[in-house]
Design a protein with these regions (language model features):
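Residue-level detector of anion-binding/catalytic polar loops
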Residues: 21, 85, 160
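Structural motif
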Residues: 30, 89-91, 144
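Asp-based, Mg2+/Mn2+-dependent phosphohydrolase catalytic module
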Residues: 80, 94, 98-187
Length: 187
C-alpha cells in the first residue's frame, strides 16, 4: 500500500499536537523501524505514548489518503492460486494494519506487526516468527521490501530479498541482486 501521504498527514497532526520540531522528511528517513525507535532516532525524549496515540489517530482520520499500488489484488490472487503463503511484516501497529488491509480487502496467511514483546526491524526475530507460523523454511522464503531496514531484516534472517523499486526506499546497495519495478512482477 502507498501510505506516504497518510504518514505525512499523521506526522503533521502529531507534530502540531505535541509541539515537535522534527520535519516529516526527518521522520520519513527512519520509516520501517518501530515507531518508538523512530522517535528515539529523532531525539524525542518524552511523551512517547501520547505521541504514538496521536500519530495513530491522525493516520486513521486520514485513511482515505492511502492508495493501493496497481494490480495488487490481482497479483495476490495469482500468488495464492500458485499456493504461495503470503505474510505482511510491518512496523505499523496491528490495529491500523488491519484497518488498512480491510479497506483494500487484502488477506494474508499471517500478519506480523510491530510489538513491544519482540524485536522489530532490522532484527530477524519477527521474520523467524513468520516462518515458524507458516511452517516455511528459509530456503523457501523471500522478503519483498522497499526500505533499507527491510533489506537488513531479510539479511539478518538469512532469507532472500527482493527490492521493490516502486516503493519508498530508492536503495542503491550493491548487495541487492534482485528487484522488481512493479508489484505484478511477483506473480
Amino acid at each position: 500500500l502507498n501510505s506516504k501521504l497518510n504518514m505525512r498527514y499523521a506526522w503533521k497532526y502529531t507534530s502540531k499536537r505535541n509541539k515537535l520540531k522534527n520535519t516529516f522528511d526527518e521522520y520519513f528517513k527512519h520509516v520501517g523501524l518501530p515507531f518508538l525507535k523512530i522517535l528515539e532516532e529523532m531525539g524525542v525524549k518524552k511523551n512517547f505514548r501520547k505521541i504514538k496515540n496521536d500519530y495513530d489517530r491522525g493516520s486513521i482520520r486520514n485513511i482515505n489518503s492511502i492508495t493501493s499500488f496497481p494490480n495488487v489484488l490481482k497479483t495476490i490472487s495469482n500468488l495464492k492460486e500458485q499456493n504461495k503463503k503470503l505474510a505482511i511484516f510491518t512496523s505499523k501497529d496491528e490495529k491500523r494494519t488491519k484497518i488498512f488491509l480491510k479497506k483494500f480487502n487484502l488477506r494474508f496467511d499471517h500478519i506480523e506487526c510491530g510489538k513491544k514483546t519482540i524485536k522489530g526491524k532490522p532484527f530477524p526475530d519477527q521474520i523467524n516468527k513468520i516462518l515458524n507460523k507458516l511452517k516455511c523454511s528459509k530456503k523457501q522464503a523471500v522478503y519483498v521490501g522497499d526500505m533499507y531496514h527491510d533489506y537488513l531484516s531479510a539479511k539478518n534472517a538469512k532469507i532472500d530479498f527482493i527490492f521493490a523499486k516502486y516503493g519508498y526506499g530508492g536503495l542503491r546497495i550493491l548487495e541487492i541482486k534482485k528487484f522488481i519495478n512493479k508489484f505484478e512482477e511477483l506473480a
